[in-house]
Amino acid sequence: MSLRIALIATVLIAIALPAIAADAQLSAAVASHQRASENTVRDRFRHPAASLAFWGLKPGQTVVEIAPANGYWTEILAPYLKATGGHYIAAEGKDGQKLPAKFADRAVYGDIGYTVFSDSSGALGSAGSADLVLTARNIHDWMWTPGFAEKGMGDFYAVLKPGGILAVEEHRADPRPQIGDARDGYVATATIVSMAKKAGFVLEASSEINANPKDTKDHPFGVWTLPPTRLSGPSGQPGNPHFDHSKYDAIGESDRMTLRFRKPA
């Protein structure tokens, strides 16, 4: 091997090693025994490693997750960002809700930051301070309050750095039309793309990672008929103990769009 070839090989290895290490950190976070079993069992539907790689998660980023609920993504993102020198921020509702108590363990999850996100909240953080904003299966809820989803898109745009990423996972109505303001939980891809573009974002890529062709999208209690919610009656009313879940369990979790938007640099 010539000296020139050896030098080129050394440079290529040096370039590749950080990416390999980052992949290893993400794999470790996904495989961690710290994750709840009710979350890991959903990985076959939510494809966390592939989704995060598609969205452009990188070591050392500042990531804001909108409405993380029980922490499906928090269990992965917070340890990963702690290990790679980044920062995880949870954007919760105006009632001051915080993540489950286990996430206070700094040795595992790092120093999780909190901010407020609602239809009347202020900025998510300092302008241009975040590398990535993640919203997973939330937008349909905001559409029931006039102007809320549009406000959200503006908030995300403001907190992101130039070149920053808006990562979206949402129940997909396509190819059938969206029903009104998505009361069944299914949103048309065109609806979200339009809102994001009006806020200034550019749609950079879409993926079928979280597609589910078994989802017929005509369930009696909307998307919540499917796992993991498995409603057996209208939302807010007592369930039907005789409801047959088998058809819906066989479908699995919903068909979802997976989108990556970018704030222009």
Name what the model sees in each region:
Residues 26-54, 58:
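Class I SAM-dependent methyltransferase Rossmann-like catalytic core
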Residues 243-265:
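C-terminal lobe and adjacent flexible extensions of AdoMet/dcAdoMet transferase-like proteins
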Residues 149-162:
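A short glycine-rich, Lys/Arg-flanked "PGG" loop and its adjoining helix->strand segment in the class I
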